[in-house]
């Protein structure tokens, strides 16, 4: 049932066509009439980055994806512009096209760029959090006084130095 490209009359000239046919058969087997049914079956209880990745993977399997990562990156840049506009407009976070919605769109597209490059967004964010923690610890250790007694300029200078030092160690 699941291998029509081998055992049945289904015609698939390319590997992409095989994958599309495969997804259609998997949906039929699960009683899902459409890709929308398939994506609605992705559990809401998953961490949001994993859920976004699953949604994007399912729709990509039927051809609903960017062909090139650079195109997805352009869309991410567009979403960042929309976020900037929402911030500058003073719209409340929960308003339509407000900051909350636009931040969500930025995260969703960043996840898409990661997926297209074979990077698990959840893992990438975990690593970024660890890197932030390391840098912040270095800032605190090098400050020589409580951080709440440092000016913004001092904190930024300490951050740049911590980033430079830690990045040099990881090379």
Question: Where is each model-derived feature located?
Answer:
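Flexible "arm" and connector segments at domain edges
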Residues: 1-103, 108-171
